[in-house]
């Protein structure tokens, strides 16, 4: 199961890289549905190129209705805390959105959505690597892929980077410090950069709403 999820994720990442190499468009606001297939890609070529490095680790999907103990990961001092939002309409042909200031991109494969859907992603100013993804409760027909760079996070260059993953919360935790209870740990693939350190990771998502970078 883990291998199958990884193959699907890697295939989509490689497809995203090919598309990015053909486009330098950035989604900074709502676009028409017809632009979703080839007009929403953000230009984070370096992010996806980094994914072509060595796979260091794959963290398998986990879920527990009673909650899984995790710790939210903070941004590093190099990151400027601010509320950043990107929104666009994505159709059945797929597309991508990015928040460059948060080193974040999300890619929807063709067929993930049943029809044109307005997608909105917000990176908050909490000081943690956390995102609100709307519409809340949206379920995908195919997994979508989040790409998160690690360089501006507090785990970069530490052993914790090899145990950092995407975590799902049904509601927005009021306090992100200390021990948290995640409902899911998403399938996470961690890649190295030229330095050999964990540089970037992908999360495979089956639904929205509240996700963050966390560690066990």
Where do the language-model regions lie?
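Bacterial N-terminal signal peptides that target proteins for export
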Residues: 2-11
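B-type heme-binding environments
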Residues: 108
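Contiguous beta-strand segments within globular domains
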Residues: 137-148
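C-terminal motif of bacterial Sec signal peptides marking the signal peptidase cleavage site
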Residues: 18-21
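Short beta-strand elements of extracellular/lumenal beta-sandwich folds
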Residues: 127-133
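Beta-strand secondary-structure signal
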Residues: 105, 130, 145-147, 202
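Proteolytic cleavage junctions
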Residues: 23-105, 113-119, 124, 136-139, ...
